[in-house]
Curated annotation (Swiss-Prot):
InterPro entries xrefs: NA-bd_OB-fold (IPR012340), Ribos_protein_bS1-like (IPR050437), Ribosomal_bS1 (IPR000110), Ribosomal_protein_S1-like (IPR035104), S1_domain (IPR003029)
Functional description taken from the UniProt entry: Binds mRNA; thus facilitating recognition of the initiation point. It is needed to translate mRNA with a short Shine-Dalgarno (SD) purine-rich sequence.
GO molecular function: mRNA binding; structural constituent of ribosome
Record organism: Buchnera aphidicola subsp. Acyrthosiphon pisum (strain APS) (Acyrthosiphon pisum symbiotic bacterium)
A single cellular component GO annotation: cytosolic small ribosomal subunit
Gene from which this protein is expressed: rpsA
Protein name: Small ribosomal subunit protein bS1
């Protein structure tokens, strides 16, 4: 009875071991080009594809006679052969290792080999695990290029074989390794200390440095005295650097580091080293839309504003003048030590065309140039040196209003003008066209003395004045109040527009360029006809009406 029970038990064990999916022991019988023959003590030897025995480098790490674990795929495949799998057995072994590591909180070796949503994938002996982004390190890590492809230690924090789900943490390993070292470092750490560290990670705002169990932040503004666009300009991941502890918050375990603080501040007493108007050479480090930055010494940069790049083009883009790494000559315009700002000038190291023009073109000098533009207030003329001069509307003609006189000019016309004024500081040149000729007003009053009797033509009138056209395109003014005191309303009404009239020069207003006239006094017999001989037969009722009103107004005043 006992023998029968023992026999049945042994047979049942064999049956369990030979069920599909079970792991059994086998011996390598032979190794062929494409297949490996394995004897697992079953009905027949099984051929397993050689690829299942290759390592990650594609090499075989077995030899004939080795005993290995294999998974039983099928006892009978329909052709009388048993199917075995080395690959499934290795995967089973890998899961056992992970389960053991998870239970005992041991580390496993894996390789980060890809990025997925929320984290990364890790290869653990043919098992694909998930590494959350927050568990890569004790500090946030955006870029894992320096970690990918390397064998790293991880801790298994979640395991579910049925769902094929494995979650690992690298952060847990680091925290465990650093705990003792970290405690000692935190105890000894003091502000102002000089320490060594290894750059672990770079961000847009700085670099995280491992001080030996404790990470510190080296902010981008504390990397160098000069302006730094990105931390990679100063340090790289893996660099061992000397740094200074700037601030240490023990409660929050936060450490602020400084690299530039290891050296002297180059901004101290910089105004003494570089007084205003000092000329020096520097290297262009960066271009912007508003100017370029020039390094004048290690850690010190100044800004050449776009307005200080070229004398004649105020809106030129910096890239049209300089390029990065150009060595240029600049002038110190202003230094603000408190705000650590230096204003530099590029154009100040070149000839100032405005100053040069002022030295070679005094008032009254004639110039020749093409019209560059015509505006509501005047004409701009291009001059030598790439600068412009302005002819104001009031300086186009002596006798014709500027708005009318400017009409005969057009862009690109070559014209002459006279220099009226040069303001090199404000970069302004005033020119005149009418000054090319004598002022007809001055000429006229020079040739005609007060009291001279001349002939004019009535041009227009209002309730106060009669405007009289004179020779040389000049005009004179007769005040109606002067007329009504001498002549009757009937006589006044004889006057008509375009009538020739004898007038006497009364006075000159040089400032306002006005010639005042009076009607020439004549004998009583001659008052019948105030006007000079004329063929004008035109009656002007409006003129007569105005004269009548003016006459009445004058009488009422009396």
């Amino acid at each position: 009875m006992n023998e029968s029970f023992a026999q049945l038990f042994e047979e049942s064990l064999k049956e369990i071991k030979t069920r599909p999916g079970s792991i059994i022991r086998g011996t390598i019988v032979s190794i062929e080009k494409d297949m490996v023959l394995v004897d697992a003590g079953l009905k027949s030897e099984s051929a397993i594809p050689v690829e299942q025995f290759q390592n990650s480098q594609g090499l075989l790490d077995i030899q004939v006679g080795d005993q290995i674990d294999v998974a039983l795929d099928a006892i009978e495949d329909g052709f009388g052969e048993t199917l075995l799998s080395r690959e499934k057995a290795k995967r089973h072994e890998a899961w056992l290792i992970l389960e053991k590591a998870h239970e005992k909180s041991e580390t496993v070796i894996g390789i980060i080999n890809g990025k997925v949503k929320g984290g990364f994938t890790v290869e653990l002996n043919d098992i694909r695990a998930f590494l959350p982004g927050s568990l890569v390190d004790v500090r946030p890590v955006r870029d894992t290029i320096h970690l990918e492809g390397k064998e790293l230690e991880f801790k298994v924090i979640k395991l579910d074989q049925k769902r094929n789900n494995v979650v690992v943490s690298r952060r847990a390993v680091i925290e465990s390794e650093n705990s003792a070292e970290r405690d000692q470092l935190l105890e000894n750490l003091q502000e102002g200390m000089h320490v060594k560290g290894i750059v672990k990670n770079l961000t847009d705002y700085g670099a995280f440095v491992d001080l030996g169990g404790v990470d510190g932040l080296l902010h981008i503004t504390d990397m160098a005295w000069k302006r730094v666009k990105h931390p990679s300009e100063i340090v790289n991941v893996g660099d061992e650097i000397n740094i200074k502890i700037l601030k240490f918050d023990r409660e929050r375990t936060r450490v602020s580091l400084g690299l530039k603080q290891l050296g002297e501040d180059p901004w101290i007493a910089i105004s003494k080293r570089y007084p205003e108007e000092t000329k020096l050479s520097g290297r262009v480090t960066n271009l912007t839309d508003y100017g370029c930055f020039v390094e004048i010494e290690e850690g010190v940069e100044g800004l050449v504003h776009v307005s200080e790049m070229d004398w004649t083009n105020k809106n030129i883009h910096p890239s049209k003048v300089v390029t990065v790494n150009d060595v240029v000559e600049v002038m110190v315009l202003d230094i603000d030590e408190e705000r650590r700002r230096i204003s530099l000038g590029l154009k100040q190291c070149k000839i100032n065309p405005w100053k040069e023009f002022s030295e070679t073109h005094k008032k009254g000098v004639h110039v020749l140039g093409k019209i560059k533009s015509i505006t509501d207030f005047g004409i701009f003329i291009g001059l030598n040196g790439g600068i412009d001069g302005l002819v104001h509307l009031s300086d186009i003609s002596w006798t014709i209003p500027g708005e009318e006189a400017v009409v005969k000019y057009k862009k690109n016309d070559e014209i002459s003008a006279v220099v009226l004024q040069v303001d090199a500081e404000r970069e302004r040149i005033s020119l005149g066209i009418k000054q090319l000729e004598e002022d007809p007003f001055n000429t006229y009053i020079a040739n005609h003395k007060k009291g001279a009797i001349i002939t004019g033509i009535i041009k227009s009138l209002d309730k106060k004045n009669i405007i009289v056209k004179l020779p040389e395109n000049l005009e004179g003014v007769i005040k109606l109040t002067e007329i009504t005191r001498v002549y009757s309303e009937t006589m006044i009404n004889k006057l008509k527009i375009e009538d020739k009239i004898l007038v006497k020069l009364s006075s000159f207003d040089r400032k306002n360029r006005i010639i005042y006239l009076t009607i020439h006094m004549i004998d009583e017999d001659e008052k019948k006809d105030l006007t000079a001989p004329s063929n004008n037969k035109t009656n002007d009722d409006s003129f007569s009406n105005v004269m009548t009103e003016a006459f009445k107004a004058a009488k009422n005043t009396e």
